[in-house]
Amino acid sequence: MNRFIDWLWVRRLRRLPHFRSPKMLGLPQKQRVLVFAPHSDDEWIGCGGTLSLLKANQCEIRVVVLSDGAQGDPSHFFEGDVKKKRQSETREVLGVLGIDDPCFLNFPDGGLAEHLADLRRAVAQIYDEFAPDWVFTTSFTEHHRDHVCVAYAVAHHWLSRGRRERLLAYEIYGSIRVDWLVDITSVMALKRDMIRRYEIPLHYVDYEAACVSVAQFRGILVAGDPLEASFAEAFMEIKPLDVWLDVFGRAMDRVG
């Protein structure tokens, strides 16, 4: 068996190109795009540049923030209502693009795993009412539990609907399998400006610098002048096997 597996690997390796870049994602025109963000600012960190380009393509975009953001200021830099502040930041930033009326589900920040049944019902209702053509969510490889819970709720409803829409996972804290890239060089300055408007998170992490670094790293794979900096956002196209492998892997983790 080991010899056979070794033979398969050798055949595969010899057929690989010297360097293989992910494909560039062709963005739709005038379609309905639904974005699920575990927390305020996740939508901009993960796919803000792509949302800017989709809005320029006259797409109708709905952003859903699932947690209430109450745990977003543990050191109490902000003296007012943290939940209201984080929601107002989201409204302001999305309003710059003309994305109005973001939906806030107000599940407990950091506690989505304790409300999975309600989370799935809420995701399903919004999903079905909006009837999207494209859906963006966090990935199963995230290191934040809330992010994985959102990926779980969205992906399982997508499966139940028969996988009719394109479902793409963006990256925040966990790297993903890069199936697609979107060149966001033309809107990177806008993305940086929008990230700076989320004041509370910036007290804890320099998300602007982090976003620039990740986008520039992903931009290495964008074809173009190697002497000019390119910026990109990466996406994983979720497939049914990804969902089942994740569930199986987590079950085995619990058994072990």
Locate the predicted segments by residue.
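Active-site beta-strand->loop->alpha-helix modules in alpha/beta enzyme cores, enriched
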Residues: M1-S40, W44-A169, R196, S213, ...
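Carbohydrate-associated surface elements
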Residues: Y173
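A conserved mid-domain beta-alpha-beta active-site/ligand-binding segment of alpha/beta enzyme cores
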Residues: R177-V178, V182-L202, D206-I220
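Short, well-ordered beta-strand micro-motif
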Residues: D183, A234-M236
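Amphipathic alpha-helical coiled-coil segments
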Residues: L221-D225
